[in-house]
Amino acid sequence: MNIKSLLLGSAAALVAASGAQAADAIVAPEPEAVEYVRVCDAYGAGYFYIPGTETCLRISGYVRYDVKGGDDVYTGSDRKGWDKGARFALMFNTNSETELGTLGTYTQLRFNYTSNNSRHDGQYGDFSDDRDVADGGVSTGTDLQFAYITLGGFKVGIDESEFHTFTGYLGDVINDDVVADGSYRTGKIAYTFTGGNGFPAVIALEQGGEDVDNDYTIDGYMPHVVGGLKYAGGWGSIAGVVAYDSVIEEWATKVRGDVNITDRFSVWLQGAYSSAATPNQNYGQWGGDWAVWGGAKFIATEKATFNLQAAHDDWGKTAVTANVAYELVPGFTVTPEVSYTKFGGEWKDTVAEDNAWGGIVRFQRSF
């Protein structure tokens, strides 16, 4: 064997080995394209598509801190010091389109803290411990305030009663229900019809709610029933609701009108009547047969809004509240509020003092 043959044989072997190794090599697949979060603007600001779906999600919430002093305008008692409360609320909205309309959900979790010098503040909801803070103390709790599903005009889950939501709330004040107009949170099945003529209507079957002292939930299979009709236009709106309390077998009704005087100034007035002249019921919780509420809202500047509410019921309770909501920077609002309650008539013997003056300052960061 000569040198030339040896070199040619070695080269051929080397080429064959290289080809075999190339045939056995693992080829890495091409990387998949990264699917970044997409903005969903079909349902308003803050929504984005859940990756891999056509469902839009929005996460929002607020952090709030309240400081209260003076009298308790709900009971007439002297606080004898500062009452404080904090809340972190976290909200989730989802929406997607189906052949039956928009399919949506809404949930709200509340994490509450209350440190009272003198009394329990029911405004901060359910507490996880058993300590009674009526005479002072600290309490904390977590509350699932809302959890419902919507499909078109259909709604089912935990929400606030249509007795409130359909007509509207009692003004943009903190102490809005000193003259109460019914319990709020309830399990319900509701349907709202919205025609093209500006006349939405609602029908709801409700479980009933509860507060610190009373339980208004149904005691059998028969639900509470709420029905309502509304007309809305550029000038404002007028709405009415009728509710049947299946526990006490009585009914209550409210009629409300809102008028936009200008694009910065609006007023509203609401009257109510109950066939059962007692606050111990699910809907007509004012004193006596009737009650009336009224209020105004004035947008003074881009940062400051003035709110006023006044109310009176058949038993002689009169309540007035005013505040200024001032937005220091976008998303952060400070609201000082002053309230007065006169306990007259049949209310006089149920409270510590006939006249109560109270104040509150709320700090809230919304996101």
UniProtKB/Swiss-Prot annotation:
In Gene Ontology terms, what is a biological process of this protein? monoatomic ion transport
Mind listing the UniProt keywords for this protein, alphabetically? Cell outer membrane, Ion transport, Membrane, Porin, Signal, Transmembrane, Transmembrane beta strand, Transport
> Sorted alphabetically, which InterPro entries does this protein's record hold?
Porin_alphabac (IPR003684)
The compartments listed are:
Cell outer membrane
The record's section on Pfam families has:
Porin_2
Q: What else is known?
A: The pore formed by Omp2a is larger than the one formed by Omp2b. Omp2b pores have optimal permeability to allow growth and protection against harmful compounds. The larger pore formed by Omp2a may be advantageous for intracellular growth, when the bacterium is competing with the host cell for nutrients whose concentration is particularly low within the phagosome.
Q: Which family does it belong to?
A: Belongs to the alphaproteobacteria porin family.
Name this polypeptide is given: Porin Omp2a
Question: Which organism's genome codes for this protein?
Answer: Brucella neotomae
